[in-house]
Swiss-Prot record:
GO terms of molecular function: ATP binding; tRNA binding; tRNA-uridine 2-sulfurtransferase activity
Enzyme Commission number, as recorded: 2.8.1.13
Region ranges (Interaction with target base in tRNA): 95-97
Domain of life the protein comes from: Bacteria
Cross-referenced HAMAP family: tRNA_thiouridyl_MnmA (MF_00144)
Protein name: tRNA-specific 2-thiouridylase MnmA
Amino acids binding ATP: A8, M9, S10, G11, G12, V13, D14, S15, M35, G124
Function: Catalyzes the 2-thiolation of uridine at the wobble position (U34) of tRNA, leading to the formation of s(2)U34.
Catalytic activity: S-sulfanyl-L-cysteinyl-[protein] + uridine(34) in tRNA + AH2 + ATP = 2-thiouridine(34) in tRNA + L-cysteinyl-[protein] + A + AMP + diphosphate + H(+)
Family according to the record: Belongs to the MnmA/TRMU family.
Main location: cytoplasm
Length: 361
């Protein structure tokens, strides 16, 4: 009997192509599953859920596959969104996509797949998995511009054992071409960007609905002079340049730290200011695809679009590591995910813990 694969269909071109490839080029029985994580009334229609569902219906109809819907809105609010708000209110910059993958897509959605009689879950992530005697390895996607292994660095290893990533060996250009040649309804649909529950609204106008404004000072760290004012230190991220609205200097200003107790945002002037760079950090909430005891040196990404940075890892108990970089790294942000790599293989990841007040190299 042919095995069943359930495709997580978002209404976008990537998951549409996944369903198309599995339907037409494998022997699997293919089902579609649309996952709703946000109630539109919760956020004044911030997510285009209705339009996305219509696109799932169209593509499923084109491919002649059955499709289902599941809502994890309550669980998403409890396990992802609440942590997002708590993190920001405490001055961190959490990554909800990493949390969503771990808590929703590769946990609750996996359970729904089994309820539907599925043997495998397939998604449109640009990454790969490779089994060996120790389980499954998470590998980068071959398209360096679209590789999404970073977002899965916090996902439990066992959650990836029955997962298929058909786009891991393809580029975005190839995926668009496949969609166009197949005449899929989503072939020309734009990629979604940013955080789903924020949509197209400015980040500040969204966050202030949940975390109250609190006016405070913007301080030049070098001179300790007040150079401006803000409506909440939680709106600012280490390394941020835009939105400061500070004049009086030929050099651009960057956020270099925050004092959440005093509600102060610290800035420095110049993109090469030494306080913007760090040589080490602590990571917690660790998740490993290999034994951390086997790792001494590796590379790391401190944010999605950052370069790989060579580093060494020093274990500090069960759920903490000290990461020392070979060269200073700019704008390390507390609360963001850090992913560790050995070449194309993702070794694991964690959450960055670093002082929010400026620290010299």
């Amino acid at each position: 009997m042919n095995k069943t694969v359930v495709v997580a269909m978002s209404g976008g071109v990537d998951s549409s192509v996944v369903a198309y490839l599995l339907k037409n080029y494998t022997s699997y029985k293919v089902l579609g599953l649309f996952m709703k994580n946000w109630e539109e009334e919760d956020g004044e229609g911030l997510c285009s859920t209705a339009k996305d569902y219509e696109d799932v219906e169209k593509v499923a109809g084109q491919l002649d596959i059955p499709y289902y819907t599941v809502s994890f809105a309550k669980e998403y609010r409890e396990r992802v969104f609440s942590r997002f708000l708590t993190g920001y209110s405490e001055g961190y910059t959490p990554n909800p996509d990493v949390l969503c993958n771990r808590e929703i897509k590769f946990d609750l959605l996996q359970k729904k797949v089994r309820e539907l009689g599925g043997d495998f879950l397939a998604t449109g992530h640009y990454c790969r998995v490779s089994p060996d005697e120790n389980g499954v390895n998470l590998l980068r996607g071959i398209d360096p511009q679209k590789d999404q292994s970073y977002f899965l660095c916090g996902t439990r290893k066992e959650s990836l054992e029955n997962v298929i990533f058909p786009l891991g060996d393809k580029t975005k250009t190839e995926v668009r071409s496949i969609a166009a040649q197949a005449g899929l309804a989503t072939a020309q649909k734009r990629d979604s960007t940013g955080i789903c529950f924020i949509g197209k609204r400015p980040f500040k106008s969204f966050l202030e609905k949940f975390v109250p404004n609190l006016e405070g000072n913007i301080v030049d760290y070098d001179s300790q002079r007040v150079v401006g004012h803000h409506e909440g230190a939680h709106y600012y991220t280490i390394g941020q340049r835009r939105g400061l609205d500070l004049g009086g200097s030929e050099k651009p200003c960057y956020v270099v730290g925050k004092d959440m107790e005093k509600n102060i945002v610290y800035i420095v002037r110049g993109e090469d200011h030494p306080l913007l760079y760090q040589t080490e950090l602590t990571a917690r909430e660790l998740n490993w695809f290999v034994s951390p005891k086997s790792i001494t040196t590796c590379s790391a990404k401190v944010r999605y679009r950052s370069n790989d940075e060579e580093c060494e890892i020093l274990l500090r108990g069960e759920d903490e590591v000290l990461v020392r970089f070979a060269s200073p790294v700019k704008a390390i942000t507390p609360g963001q995910a850090i992913a560790f790599y050995d070449g194309e293989r993702c070794l694991g990841g964690g959450v960055i813990e670093i002082s929010m007040t400026p620290q010299s190299v």
